[in-house]
């Protein structure tokens, strides 16, 4: 990858829509980030095809049988892969495993996640459907730094959209996804340019 650009590891378990959007953004040599590798817990994840299309290295980890929890030792394997790839930032983009120890210790303040709700509302799985079924008038997405809590780390960026009368849950999900792609690239760029700083729970440096 290009010298001087922030090397990003993207973690994904599924189709890799956010991964693909970020990889496309990184094709611009003027962009501050480059995707160093994909880390996935699923050897059949469609995100692997995306990585091959962009000639991005793939690391499939032996995560263990339980969805959510990683097997003992898996995080140490992840840290080793990331260090081998000279990773500076980790982006969780639909990674369906919980990071609890080694990764967060090794990359403190350098792990961010994209979540499809306006946190702190609607944490966890199927956040878009949660919001739709609750009847909110405003939905959206959040990029936040990752800590040991569930979707509870300091918020970097958020984007809000109106929920229309004719929306269904899938329509809302697709419109939120457009915003996910936009603010994830923006957050990675702000990190790469050294703009972000955390003061207690606030992330500063996000304004133009």
Where are these regions (language model features)?
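One-carbon transfer enzymes
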Residues: 1-208
């Amino acid at each position: 990858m290009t010298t001087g650009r922030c090397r990003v590891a993207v973690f994904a378990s599924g189709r890799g829509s956010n991964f693909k959007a970020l990889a496309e953004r990184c094709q611009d040599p003027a962009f501050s980030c480059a995707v160093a590798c994909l880390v996935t817990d699923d050897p059949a994840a469609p995100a692997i095809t995306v990585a091959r299309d962009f000639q991005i290295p793939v690391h499939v980890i032996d995560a263990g049988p339980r969805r959510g929890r990683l097997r003992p030792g898996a995080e140490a394997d992840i840290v080793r892969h990331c260090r081998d790839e000279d990773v500076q930032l980790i982006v969780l983009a639909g990674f369906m495993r919980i990071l609890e120890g080694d990764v967060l210790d090794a990359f403190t303040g350098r792990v961010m996640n994209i979540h499809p709700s306006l946190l702190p509302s609607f944490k966890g799985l199927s956040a878009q459907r949660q919001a739709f079924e609750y009847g909110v008038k405003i939905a959206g997405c959040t990029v936040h730094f990752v800590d040991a809590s569930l979707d509870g780390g300091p918020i970097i960026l958020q984007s809000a959209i109106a929920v229309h009368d004719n929306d269904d849950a899938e329509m809302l999900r697709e419109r939120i996804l457009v915003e996910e792609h936009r603010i994830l690239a923006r957050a990675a760029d702000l990190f790469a340019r050294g703009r972000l700083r955390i003061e207690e729970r606030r992330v500063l440096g996000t304004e133009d």
